[in-house]
């Protein structure tokens, strides 16, 4: 019985540091820090209407944004992060662009492509949920996944395969 109690205490003590490192929301300062830790240049500001954090960031030559959603408290801490990047088509959107968007979305598990026809832009986004608590490693891996989504998106839309 003493061994069982000792084992339960040890498990509880080992779990405590992991729970302390769990994050269920990020402030603007924390968002900037995790993006910087991932090797990305980022500038965090606030949304003019909601005062929620918004980051403008660079992944190589690609500019993207991270909009923080589902925020509470002061400073605002947000449990949902939406990463997105938009690209100029250089022309009006065509039916083949919609086919390419659909093909990307059919094949890609992470990330979602979309068209902004009134702006002649095409884009991709990726949502990261923190609600319920996630580790710093989980956040880091999701940021790396986002850069992979950008690469897959650019590769897909740079291919010569019309409608695929």
Regions found by a protein language model. Give the residues of each.
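A short, solvent-exposed beta-edge/loop patch
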Residues: 108-150, 154
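Long, continuous compositionally biased terminal/linker segments
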Residues: 57-87
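Charge-rich, low-complexity N-terminal segments
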Residues: 3-4, 16-63
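Short, internal acidic amphipathic alpha-helical interface segments
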Residues: 22, 36-38, 79-121
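Extracytoplasmic/secreted envelope proteins and their assembly/folding machinery
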Residues: 28-35, 95-101, 140-143, 147
């Amino acid at each position: 019985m003493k061994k069982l109690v000792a084992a339960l205490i040890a498990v509880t003590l080992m779990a405590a540091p992991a729970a302390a490192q769990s994050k269920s929301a990020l402030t603007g300062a924390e968002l900037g820090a995790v993006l910087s830790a991932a090797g990305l240049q980022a500038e965090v500001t606030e949304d003019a209407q909601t005062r929620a954090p918004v980051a403008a960031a660079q992944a190589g030559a690609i500019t993207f944004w991270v909009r923080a959603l589902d925020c509470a408290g002061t400073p605002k801490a947000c449990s949902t992060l939406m990463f997105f990047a938009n690209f100029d088509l250089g022309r009006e959107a065509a039916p083949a662009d919609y086919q390419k968007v659909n093909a990307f979305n059919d094949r890609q598990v992470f990330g979602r492509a979309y068209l902004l026809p009134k702006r002649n832009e095409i884009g991709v986004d990726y949502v990261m949920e923190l609600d319920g608590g996630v580790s710093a490693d989980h956040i880091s891996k999701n940021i790396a996944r986002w850069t992979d989504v950008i690469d897959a998106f650019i590769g897909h839309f740079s291919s010569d395969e019309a409608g695929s």
